[in-house]
């Protein structure tokens, strides 16, 4: 948290911006947007072996309750408006993780007429998790990278 100084009187001094960002990283609530086989790996990351709940990451069923969206799988042209609508319903500040090669750039179905070549054409993406499908460890690493990015942002100046 980049604590500036610990005083002998028994309290800590820091900036409000750093404290807010530190608290945000401890309670990230992702909205699952599972479209294909990458969603199975996302479910595995929330299951008992990896247990994302211990990191304060609790999957939420509603976009109004979440601040992170994990797009996992092939995004078709028909699902693109739904993705944008769910993204717009999320409260600020919000972040997006693109999981898998299909969500990142179209993947194996890149040349299909009905596939969007990356969900970053519809919503702004903060973290890309590569793989086909990416493992649960890769998703957890992507979430850790997002936490580091959140700590670096300037929240109050937004």
Curated annotation (Swiss-Prot):
Q: Which cofactor does it need?
A: [4Fe-4S] cluster
Keywords for this protein: 4Fe-4S, Cell inner membrane, Cell membrane, Iron, Iron-sulfur, Membrane, Metal-binding, NAD, Quinone, Translocase, Transport, Ubiquinone
Membrane topology category: Peripheral membrane protein
Localization recorded for this chain is: Cell inner membrane
What does the record say about how the cofactor binds? Binds 1 [4Fe-4S] cluster.
Q: Which cysteines are joined by disulfide bonds?
A: none
Q: Where does [4Fe-4S] cluster bind?
A: 37-38, 102, 132
EC?
Answer: 7.1.1.-
* Catalytic activity reported: a quinone + NADH + 5 H(+)(in) = a quinol + NAD(+) + 4 H(+)(out)
| UniProt similarity note | Belongs to the complex I 20 kDa subunit family.
HAMAP family named in the record:
NDH1_NuoB (MF_01356)
Q: Which NCBIfam families match?
A: nuoB_fam, PRK06411.1
**This protein is called what?**
NADH-quinone oxidoreductase subunit B
The gene name reads: nuoB
């Amino acid at each position: 948290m980049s604590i500036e100084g610990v005083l002998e009187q028994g309290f800590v001094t820091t900036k409000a911006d750093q404290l807010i960002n530190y608290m945000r990283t401890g309670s990230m609530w992702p909205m699952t947007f599972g479209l294909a086989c990458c969603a199975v790996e996302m479910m595995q990351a929330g299951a008992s072996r990896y247990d994302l709940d211990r990191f304060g990451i609790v999957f939420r069923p509603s976009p109004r309750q979440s601040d992170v969206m994990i797009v996992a799988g092939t995004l078709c042209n028909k699902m693109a408006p739904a993705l944008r609508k769910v993204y717009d319903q999320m409260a600020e500040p919000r972040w997006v993780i693109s999981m898998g090669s299909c969500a990142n750039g179209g993947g194996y179905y890149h040349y299909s007429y009905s596939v969007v070549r990356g969900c970053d054409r519809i919503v702004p993406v903060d973290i890309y998790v590569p793989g086909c499908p990416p493992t649960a460890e890769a998703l957890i690493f992507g979430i850790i990278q997002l936490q580091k990015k959140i700590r670096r942002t300037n929240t109050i100046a937004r």
